[in-house]
UniProtKB/Swiss-Prot annotation:
Location in or out of the cell: Cytoplasm
Protein name: tRNA-specific 2-thiouridylase MnmA
Role of this protein: Catalyzes the 2-thiolation of uridine at the wobble position (U34) of tRNA, leading to the formation of s(2)U34.
GO molecular function: ATP binding; tRNA binding; tRNA-uridine 2-sulfurtransferase activity
InterPro entries: MnmA-like, MnmA-like_C, MnmA-like_central, MnmA-like_central_sf, Rossmann-like_a/b/a_fold
Gene from which the chain derives: mnmA
Residues annotated for ATP binding in this entry: G8, L9, S10, G11, G12, V13, D14, S15, M34, G123
Site positions per UniProt: Interaction with tRNA: H124, Q341
Active site: C99 (nucleophile), C196 (cysteine persulfide intermediate)
GO cellular component: cytoplasm
GO biological process terms on file: tRNA wobble position uridine thiolation
Native species: Thiobacillus denitrificans (strain ATCC 25259 / T1)
Length: 358
């Protein structure tokens, strides 16, 4: 009997090509489409119906079976409730990180095992290897521009070990070329950019449906009122667009940036200039730690880390590491480090894990 791989098919080109490559390698491939959002499932806000039609069309070309599963209840309980609580607390969460750990590599993994899977696979741009102790290791993808290891840092050994990542060494243009060459109907489909499983939508309107809007003052660090915000949940550190602050009489023409949120007074603190000192930090603290190997990294060794997805790695060293507390100091100041986002550590091309920025 051939080895069975259950592939998470999203309707996009990456997971479709991943399924094709696995079939070419001789695996028994079953496609599974995950539907994880039920609210306002209409053509304006959600493309789930079209995505499923794309999955069916891909499965037809590849000659594989496909099934649909609904994890909407799990998504709301494990991901969306956290998402709302973080925004309500003034932080800026990254739902994709939790979505991967709780849905794509937990709910989906459990479902796949129940279907007799030996492995699961996704279209993520990451690699997998093993360390000197034989533990599964998460590696950067060959295509540095598409590498998604930042979003998978919360996986544990039980989740990573049965996972296959066929796109690990492929650049995105080559993935699209493969899709065109074999006649996949979604070869030119654009990449999704919305909130994990919720899709692309007006963010403020979406949040306002679940959290009450609470306008307040925008002030300088000295306390001078320069405008009004629409609700602290709508803003993130380092944000420049959408502040609605014009030039101040007798003041600088430098652009304004969000520097802090004062939850106690419902005040948004803004500063002028990209390089303002309040936007720079050498030290970063984190909690809710998760280490892929199951053990914490050696605090005596140097590492690199990133505090946001598109950021270039920066050299750092660990100053505090115990229980669920991590403190790092970077060699150079980091810009707009944002509570609620993740700081992720790397040892070369190996993603070690990380935590939620305090």
């Amino acid at each position: 009997m051939s080895t069975r791989v259950v592939v998470g098919l999203s309707g996009g080109v990456d997971s479709a090509v991943a399924a094709y490559l696995l079939k070419q390698q001789g695996y028994d491939v079953l496609g599974v489409f995950m539907k994880n959002w039920d609210d306002d499932d209409n053509t304006e806000h959600c493309t789930a119906r079209q995505d499923f039609l794309d999955v069916l069309a891909v499965a037809d070309v590849l000659g594989i079976e496909v099934e649909a599963v609904n994890f909407a209840a799990e998504y709301k309980e494990r991901v969306f409730s956290y998402f709302l609580a973080e925004y309500q607390a003034g932080r800026t969460p990254n739902p994709d990180v939790l979505c991967n750990a709780e849905i794509k590599f937990k709910a989906f993994l459990d479902d796949a095992i129940a279907r007799g899977a030996d492995y699961i696979a996704t279209g993520h741009y990451v690699g997998k290897g093993h360390d000197t102790f034989g533990r599964a290791a998460l590696l950067r993808a060959r295509d540095a521009n598409k590498d998604q290891s930042y979003f998978l840092y919360r996986l544990n050994q039980a989740q990573l070990s049965p996972a296959l990542f066929p796109l690990a060494r492929l650049p995105k243009p080559e993935v699209r070329e493969i899709a065109r060459r074999i006649g996949l109907p979604n070869a030119a489909k654009k990449d999704s950019t919305g909130i994990c499983f919720i899709g692309e939508r007006n963010f403020r309107e979406f949040l306002e449906r679940y959290l009450p809007r609470d306008p307040g003052d925008m002030t300088t660090p000295e306390g001078r009122v320069v405008g009004q915000h629409q609700g602290l949940m709508y803003y993130t550190l380092g944000q420049r667009q959408g502040l609605g602050i014009g030039g101040q009489k007798g003041g600088s023409d430098a652009p304004w940036f969000v520097a802090a949120k004062d939850m106690a007074t419902n005040t948004l603190v803004v500063v002028q200039g990209h390089d303002h000192p309040l936007l720079q930090r050498f030290g970063v603290g984190a909690g809710q730690l998760s280490w892929i190997a199951g053990v914490a990294p050696d605090p005596e060794r140097p590492y690199t880390a990133k505090t946001r997805y598109r950021q270039t790695d920066a050299a750092c060293h660990i100053t505090t590491l115990y229980d669920d507390t991590l403190e790092l100091v970077f060699d150079a100041p980091q810009w707009a480090v944002t509570p609620g986002q993740s700081v992720v550590l790397y040892d070369g091309d190996v993603c070690l894990g990380g935590g939620i920025i305090c």
